[in-house]
Swiss-Prot record:
Its EC number is 2.1.1.-. Residues 103-315 form the Adrift-type SAM-dependent 2'-O-MTase domain. It comes from African swine fever virus (isolate Tick/Malawi/Lil 20-1/1983) (ASFV). Pfam families: FtsJ (PF01728). This is Probable methyltransferase EP424R. Induction: Expressed in the early phase of the viral replicative cycle.
Amino acid sequence: MSNYYYYYGGGRYDWLKTVEPTNFLKIGLPYQAHPLHLQHQATTPPSILEKFKRAEILLNEVKAEMDPLMLQPETEKKLYQILGSIDMFKGLRKKVEFTYNAQIVTNAWLKMYELLNTMNFNNTSQAFCNCELPGGFISAINHFNHTMMHYPSFNWVASSLYPSSETDALEDHYGLYQCNPDNWLMQSPLLKKNMDYNNGDVTIASNVKNLALRATQRLTPIHLYTADGGINVGHDYNKQEELNLKLHFGQALTGLLSLSKGGNMILKHYTLNHAFTLSLICVFSHFFEELYITKPTSSRPTNSETYIVGKNRLRLFTPKEEQVLLKRLEFFNDTPLVDLSLYQNLLESVYFAVETIHLKQQIEFLNFGMKCYRHFYNKIKLLNEYLAPKKKIFQDRWRVLNKLYVLEKKHKLKLCAPLQGSVA
């Protein structure tokens, strides 16, 4: 937060400090050279988890202040309007789309482009993007590869959950699936009679194994694996991490089964306090030369979203490791995958990330949002006027830092639906 003071109509809002975006947050985790010992139900001394449990309680106490506002449509709407007003990147998507000839510019697009620009991956020319529709990650990678890396081509495969009901629409808002069916690994429910039918649900062990097989059959090597899955938890944000455990395990396992040696991985997560999540991070630390917990600047600071990044995969699964992990997904329980007492140095680094991202940044912005709600409930236009000059400065800075260039028409992805202007 920066010390800017505002005056309006003779009144002073000296507490109203523009929410200056933090820098890209990146916390490195140590590589684990000792052997990986997976367990079906590992036990962990409670003392190891105490500070993570305290962190969860502290964050949930702040989130709980918003719970009553979610119960009434009018107050819920006002709250989201206020949170939108203090989002320093609101409006950036449309600018990027029209200034740089970009496609499918969603929030996911901004985050992926920022990750690619910041993390300095060795190769992103062949990618498997999971939990992907409507396609923001693929589009950002395509834009980055052609404007920054100048690869002669970008090869990709992707998957997303295909709705089980014919009445539910596939989230193919831009026609990326419709126009590129050969790039997609999941199948319509109309093909259920097929022996190898796969609807893209990564909480099903057989689907995970099959998706990895399909990906490697169609694309080898795979230099980059991404997964942006998340279950809509409604208003129950206090259980967001817990409710997504199985999904996040499945999307991670799909990546570890398909990513080539030397490849890179980007996985969406939320808070990092549950013993199972911590154990999954410990597993990652055996496979990548570099491992990070990140929070892109363009990821809204009021949410718990984090991205785990692995660089330069060092080895593949052993048959035993693959068997144990697939079995755990099939018969899922949320006990740790490993003995966490063997990873205390790594857990210290994870906790530093929790402190930095959630206990400091997120709580600060949530408190700021609630104060704005109380003071600007019926003055949202005024709040927007105060913040507009700073938003422009921050957005212009983001565009410069992330080295955006115009995408040539010949490199654009094939989309069947007209590209609609981003809602921002």
